[in-house]
Amino acid sequence: MATSSTSSTTSLCFPATSAAGARTSFRTTDTFLRYRRSRQLTRLKVRKAVVRSDLDRDVSDMRTNAPKGLFPPEPEHYRGPKLKVAIIGAGLAGMSTAVELLDQGHEVDIYESRTFIGGKVGSFVDKQGNHIEMGLHVFFGCYNNLFRLLKKVGAEKNLLVKDHTHTFVNRGGELGELDFRFPVGAPLHGINAFLTTNQLKTYDKARNAVALALSPVVRALVDPDGAMTQIRNLDNISFSEWFMSKGGTRTSIQRMWDPVAYALGFIDCDNISARCMLTIFSLFATKTEASLLRMLKGSPDVYLSGPIRDYIIEKGGRFHLRWGCREILYEKSANGETYVTGLAMSKATQKQIVKADVYIAACDVPGIKRLLPSNWREWEFFDNIYKLVGVPVVTVQLRYNGWVTELQDVERSRQLRQAAGLDNLLYTPDADFSCFADLALASPEDYYIEGQGSLLQCVLTPGDPYMPLPNEEIISRVSKQVLALFPSSQGLEVTWSSVVKIGQSLYREGPGKDPFRPDQKTPVKNFFLAGSYTKQDYIDSMEGATLSGRQASAFICDAGEELAALRKQLAAIQSIDSIGVDEMSLV
C-alpha cells in the first residue's frame, strides 16, 4: 500500500502545515461487497433532510441548577476609564477576552504570530483549496459561554445539531450506542442511555450504574455547587482509580470510558483526573441537552473564528498577524511592585515595542512558558505553570472515493451522487484514533465536494508514538485501522490526505494538576492571563477558553481605576526619565 504526502510538525505558536494528496487502494473482494450490517443498524436514523442549526433550543440553561462558576452572570456596564489593551494570541481565549473588553468600551489590539487566527480551533486553506483543521471540534449542549459568544457575533446559525446519541464503532463494523433520546429528560434520559447501551455487557452495565450512583453526580441533582466542590476534591486521583474503587469494571473503562476520555482530554482513564470526567458526568446527569452534540457547518475559520474576527473589527479592535512577542519588558517600582512596560514584538525583520495599559497573554501552555520572563518564576504563581505540560496530538484527514461509514447498503456507499453514512461524532475503542467524524456529512459546507466521498477526520491520541513518523507511514496505519472498523469500505481508495502534528495541545489534565492552573489575575498588576488551561470550573476545551476570556475581562474591568492610575504613574516616570536623558545630552 503506497502513499505519499508531506507536512511539518509544529508547535501551537506557529502555523501547522498540512499534507499533500495521496492515493491508497484496497483490493475489492466479493465477501466484503456483500457485507451486511447486524441488527444494531435498525436503530440508526437516515440522515435528516432538514438540519436544525440555531441556538434558541436544545441548549442547557446553565443559569439555574448548575455550578455558579460555569456561566457567570452578564457583567455590569463598565463606567471607569477607557483602557488600551494588548492581547498576545488570537485563539478562542484571546478573542473571547477581546469581545468582552470591546463591549465595555476599551481599545483592543490582538497580536498573533501565525498567519491565521483561531489557535487550536483555527483552520487554513492549502494551495489545492482544502480546509485543514488543527483538530476535531465538537460542541456539547452545555457550552453556554461559547454559545453566548456565537449569538453575540451573529454566528448562532453556524452549528448543526446531531442526533442525541453517542455512537461507538467497534472492530468489524459493530456499533454500540449511548442513546439519550428519551421522552423524559435529565436524569432519566441518561439512566436509560446507560442501562440500555449495547456497548457494554449486562454485568459491566450494572457495575457502571453502581459506580455512578456512588458519585458526586447524584448530589449535583440537588446541590450543584456542593457537587462541584466534591468533584474538585477528587482531582488528585485518576478516573480509573476512582471508578474501580466504586465498583466499576476494567472492561467498562476499555470499551466505553477510555474513548470518551481520549476525546475530552487526549489521555486515557488511567491518566486523566477524576475531576475532569466527573465534571462532564455531572452536567450530563443534570442537564438534558448537555450530552447533545453539535458540529460546525464547515471550517472553523469560516464559521467560528471568522464571525468573531468580524465582530472584533467592527467594534474597533485590530488584529496584527505574524507579529510574535519576543520579550515582555518590565520594571520594579521603589516599593517592590513589578509592572509591564511594553512588549518587544517582531515580524520577520521588523521590530517594535508595543505599549498599553493592560497586557494579556492568551497563550497555550508551551506558549506561556516561552513568554514569561525567567525571573518571574520567583513567584509560586508563575512557577506552578511550569508544572503543566501539553499533550501531543496528530490530526489526520482522509478523503475517499466513496462513503466509508455507510454500513447498510454497499451500493450506496460506492455512488457519489449523494452523501451517505453516519452523521455524528464517532468514538472507537479499537483504533489509535479515539474519536473521528466524516466531515463531508457532519460539516458539509466546506467538506462535502460533489463527485467525491467521505472526508474522515481522525484524532490520534495519544499522539506520542506518531509524532516522529513520516506522514506516509501515519496515513498507511490510519487507513488500515479505518478498514478494520469498516470492513464494508474494502475497495474504496484514499484520494487525498493531510496530517497535522501539534507537539503540545491541551494541557495534560492528570491527577493533582488542577492546583497549578493559574488565575487570570496575576501578581503583576497590569499583566493578565487567558486560556483554557487557566483556572476555571470547566475542563480544557473551547468552552473553557471562552470562559477564561470572560473571567479575564471581569478582572480587568474591576481593576480599571487602579490600572488607569498606574498608566499615569508610568507616564510620569517615563517623562522624568526622558528629561534626564535630554539633560545628559545637553551636557
Curated annotation (Swiss-Prot):
GO biological process: carotene biosynthetic process; carotenoid biosynthetic process
EC number(s) stated in the UniProt entry for this protein: 1.3.5.6
Reactions accelerated catalytically: 9,9'-di-cis-zeta-carotene + 2 a quinone = 7,7',9,9'-tetra-cis-lycopene + 2 a quinol
One GO location term (cellular component): chloroplast
Pathway named in the protein's UniProt entry: Carotenoid biosynthesis; lycopene biosynthesis
One annotated GO molecular function: 9,9'-di-cis-zeta-carotene desaturase activity
Enzyme class: oxidoreductase
Entry-linked InterPro entries: Amino_oxidase (IPR002937), FAD/NAD-bd_sf (IPR036188), Zeta_caro_desat (IPR014103), Zeta_carotene_desat/Oxidored (IPR050464)
Domain of life from the UniProt record: Eukaryota
Primary location class: plastid
TM helices/strands, residue ranges: none
The entry's keywords: Carotenoid biosynthesis, Chloroplast, Chromoplast, FAD, Flavoprotein, NAD, Oxidoreductase, Plastid, Transit peptide
Family: Belongs to the zeta carotene desaturase family.
NCBIfam families on file: zeta_caro_desat
Name of the featured protein: Zeta-carotene desaturase, chloroplastic/chromoplastic
Organism field: Tagetes erecta (African marigold)
